Amino acid sequence: MRKADDEEQDVPTLKTLRESVNLTQPELSRRMGVGIRIIGDWERGESIPRFDRAVSLAKELGIPLKTLARSFGLSVEGVPNDESTN
């Protein structure tokens, strides 16, 4: 089995990420200013958030954007990690 396949198996779903910080769909919806249906669509993989919403979502969940991207099934291979420039 390829290494990428192994990594994909360990990727948490958006629902798992949300539940890991004890947020309900309604609470996350309220915090982000989006409808509950949108949160559900994201969790079911029916749509993915715009970049600005993805940034807000990552902040609310306390996760890196790369982790969020993986939860949507997006490849982040070759995307550099953020590094402090200060």
State what each model feature region is.
Residues 1-20:
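A short, Lys/Arg-rich alpha-helix, primarily the initiator
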Residues 2-5, 59, 67-86:
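Short, charged recognition helix plus adjacent turn
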Residues 13, 24, 50-53, 64:
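Residues that mark the N-terminal boundary/hinge immediately upstream of a DNA-recognition element
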Residues 15, 40-41, 50, 69:
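Key DNA-contacting residues within the recognition helix of helix-turn-helix
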Residues 18, 29, 58:
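The alpha-helix within a helix-turn-helix
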Residues 22-41:
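Short alpha-helical DNA-recognition segment
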Residues 25, 36, 46-47, 65, ...:
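The DNA-contacting recognition helix of HTH DNA-binding domains
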Residues 33, 52-68:
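DNA major-groove recognition helix of helix-turn-helix/homeodomain DNA-binding modules
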